[in-house]
Regions:
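Rossmann-like NAD(P)-binding element
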Residues: 156-159, 163, 286-340
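Adenosine-phosphate binding glycine-rich loop
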Residues: 37, 49-62, 78-82, 90, ...
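Glycine-rich phosphate/diphosphate-binding loop of Rossmann-like nucleotide-binding domains
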Residues: 87-104, 226, 230-297, 303-305
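ADP-ribose/adenylate-binding Rossmann-like module
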Residues: 176-187, 317-357
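Glycine/serine-rich phosphate-binding loop and adjoining beta1-alpha1 elements at the start
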Residues: 37-78, 112-116, 122-243, 435
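Short internal beta-strands
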Residues: 106-117, 269-271
Length: 443
């Protein structure tokens, strides 16, 4: 049974309730006139010590974020503000939430993907007084309930990861009446925001974190590249050297995945729809061909696009027996899992995190992490130091929104001064000096 926390006056009470009852508790009248409010919903509050150990570990290495906490504590921009976060809920994101809380804000958080929720980390946040609504493997209906729970208190700023909170705020404008802006983390989310802006539907200012150089050059490329292969190797216990890897998409994420696969000794094939990226990948030393031609050749297929059903059943039917399918784009719809399930004669769990599908021709196809984000659903996510950069950008942009006059609706880039501040802070904590103009040395 999940653990539910309630506030009543100054006290917090934890109760274990049947799961089906938890979603009737967002607003309860107690004795007719006293409102009882749900503070958190996690799988098991007793997991908190395990989660706290993980948070304490990443805190040691998120040195840029720690420096910015000290910097932003001076002007009290975060004090008495309400901040909502919808982001993959694991130790590094939890530490961001706690930094925001330490700066004086009240924090609500849920996971942007139910398969990426780490229940022990959610429990640790609840113990710290963060309003967390997240359970690993929750249904889509439950996920939508969690989204409502983090915005019903009308936040001043939002951190989004994929655009789902932004969509909800537009369906319920009253939730956004205090909103000064949104910080969007991902390629997928920024694309959704730009479409809304082009259609004239975007009501709020939004900063596209993903378009900052301090984000895509490091998080998207090096972070995803390393974490994707760490997860694939952990899940499969297979050797990568000598395998043929098909990377679907050659944006910054695809570049990182292909680069790390090459470094591990794999032969890499890239598939693309963008002619410039296709030529770039060829110049980088990779074979380039359509997915259908690559399908019979690949041992491991990794989708990196953020687009729906890029790896379809007609591709999967051409694959060799023993092929592995993994997704490291944002959502869990890049691989046509529904089509695979309908077509396969038989499906079973082959190993934790791996499903085996027996195709009509007898071939075995292996799906990793249910088609969700393999690096998070099947691993620990990006390296700590990489997310230190990305979350420093988030914190810097939240501070910018809270300390500035409200911007007009639209999609804004990360201000250059914030982007540069973050990367210079990283150079400082790593003890790296660089040349300035003339004889100046910057350290």
């Amino acid at each position: 049974m999940p653990s539910v926390g309630f506030s009543f006056g100054e006290s917090i009470y934890n109760r274990n309730l049947p799961k089906e009852d938890c979603f009737n508790l967002l607003e309860i009248n107690f004795k007719g006139d006293i409102k009882l409010t749900q503070d958190f919903l996690v799988k098991d509050i007793n997991l908190a010590p395990e989660g706290q150990l993980k948070i304490d570990w990443v805190a040691k290495w998120m040195k840029v974020l720690n420096r910015l906490q000290k910097k932003f504590s001076i002007d009290n921009s975060f004090k008495n503000k309400r901040v909502a976060l919808c982001i993959h809920l694991e130790a590094k994101t939890a530490y961001l939430a706690l930094i925001i809380q330490k700066l004086g804000s009240e924090v609500w958080i849920t996971s942007s993907n139910t398969l990426s929720t780490k229940d022990e980390v959610a429990a640790a946040l609840a113990k710290k007084g963060v309003h967390v609504f997240a359970i690993h493997g929750a249904s889509q209906q439950e996920y939508r309930s969690y989204l409502r729970s983090i915005v019903e208190n009308k936040p001043h700023v939002v951190v989004d990861d994929g655009g789902d909170v932004c969509e909800l705020l537009h369906r319920h404008p009253d939730y956004g009446e205090n909103l000064k802006g949104i910080c969007e983390e991902t390629t997928t989310g920024v694309a959704r925001l730009k479409l809304m802006a082009e259609d004239g539907r975007l009501r709020y200012p939004a900063i596209g974190i993903n378009d900052a150089k301090s984000k895509y050059l490091f998080d998207n490329r090096y972070g995803t590249g390393q974490s994707t292969w760490t997860a694939i190797m952990h899940l499969t216990n297979m050797n990568i050297a000598g395998k043929t890897v098909v990377v679907i998409g050659y944006g910054w994420v695809g570049r990182g995945v292909a680069l790390r696969a090459k470094g591990l000794g794999a032969e890499v094939i890239v598939t693309e729809i963008d002619p410039w990226k296709a030529l770039e990948s060829r110049m980088d030393g990779f074979k380039v061909m359509p997915i259908l031609k690559a399908a019979p050749l690949g041992d491991i297929f990794v989708t990196t696009t953020g687009l729906e059903n890029v790896l379809r059943i007609e591709h999967i039917e051409q694959m060799k027996s023993g092929a592995f399918l993994a997704n490291t784009g944002h959502f869990d719809f890049e691989i046509d899992v529904k089509g695979l399930s309908r077509t396969a004669h038989y499906m079973k769990e082959a190993r934790e995190g791996i499903e085996e599908f027996t195709m009509p021709n007898g071939n075995k196809i292996y799906l990793l992490a249910q088609g969700g984000l393999v690096n998070i659903a099947g691993g620990l996510g990006h390296p700590v130091e990489i997310m230190d950069l990305s979350f420093a950008l988030q914190l810097g942009c939240l501070h910018y929104l809270l300390s500035s006059e409200k911007l007009a609706p639209g999609v804004y880039p990360v201000p250059d001064e914030i982007d540069e501040m973050v990367v210079r802070e990283k150079l400082k904590v790593d003890g790296i000096e660089i040349d300035g103009f003339g004889k100046e040395v910057i350290g």
